[in-house]
Amino acid sequence: MGWSWIFLFLLSGTAGVHSEVQLQQSGPELVKPGASVKISCKASGYTFTDYNMHWVKQSHGKSLEWIGYIYPYNGGTGYNQKFKSKATLTVDNSSSTAYMELSSLTSEDSAVYYCAR
């Protein structure tokens, strides 16, 4: 039996009004079912610790789903109950980077993921 694969496409967006605000995400990932993946979102153009970083999922043909947020200043998090056991949000303030780790991946996790300020 051949391997199955899960494709995760990562994009970034921001609600910021200043054009210099940028969020740069890691690239697309192709991973095996059951594996984990950690994706990154590097921020620039604003004070990283001043704003929540949100993560959103969009499966093909479906509406956006909010996964959760992290407040870089103190590491506080809030999760959509649906994703509480799937996603883990962390930050590295020294590099102004937010991370989302997705665990125990299945075909249901194949989607576009966004980070957003």
UniProtKB/Swiss-Prot annotation:
Q: Which InterPro entries match?
A: Ig-like_dom (IPR007110), Ig-like_dom_sf (IPR036179), Ig-like_fold (IPR013783), Ig_V-set (IPR013106), IgHV (IPR050199)
Q: Name one GO biological process term.
A: adaptive immune response
Q: What is this protein called?
A: Ig heavy chain V region 108A
Name the PROSITE patterns on file: IG_LIKE
Extract the PANTHER family matched here.
Answer: IMMUNOGLOBULIN HEAVY CHAIN
User: What's an example GO cellular component term for this entry?
Assistant: immunoglobulin complex
Task: Extract the Pfam families matched here.
Answer: V-set
- What SUPFAM superfamilies does its record include? Immunoglobulin
Supply the source organism for this entry. Answer: Mus musculus
The gene for this chain is Igh-VJ558
Which controlled-vocabulary keywords does the entry list? Adaptive immunity, Immunity, Immunoglobulin, Signal
